[in-house]
Amino acid sequence: MKKFAILFSIIYCSVFCNTLYSQNISDTVKDVVISIEYDKVCDEFHYVAEIKDFFSSKYNKGYSDERYGSYKYYEELHNEAYKEAIRNIDSRKMGTFIYSFIPDKHKRKLGNQGWGFIVFNLSKTEGLLKYSLTIRADEGIKVGRIFTKDDCLNIFHALDTSIFNSWSEDIDYLTGAIKFRLQDTD
């Protein structure tokens, strides 16, 4: 099971990376997207499976009639958990991709304020619907609406020519969040 998940993650990431490199995107953005969560498919699968009570632990991974009733039901749970794991990782990639478009002046202004979150809802047909950037610091600093109209147009263009093209046909809507560490710019 673990070997299959690792093999699938390598194939999935290779296809994703090839799609990105065939598009007209800056090397910086490509590096950001490609480097995020490269080998986390297996871990994410176990996380999702445990939440859904599909696996009781990382060490109890096998099928049993007693636990699942039928192998068909086991396969359904497995496929559902795996699909959700891939979707979660897609969400993280997308969040990182969007974060890479934040203007440097805003990154400098934020400075070393702790952890931040970018939350987004995306649709193939509607583009970037909603986003927010929250900085968690001692003072509870919150920063929002940091993209200009031109920034948004650049994001939409990059999404249209790269990420959306790599999505499965049946995925029209994606929502999620990316947590990032703000770097000290001094």
Language-model features: locations:
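Bacterial Sec-dependent N-terminal signal peptides
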Residues: 1-30
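Charge-biased low-complexity segments
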Residues: 23-186
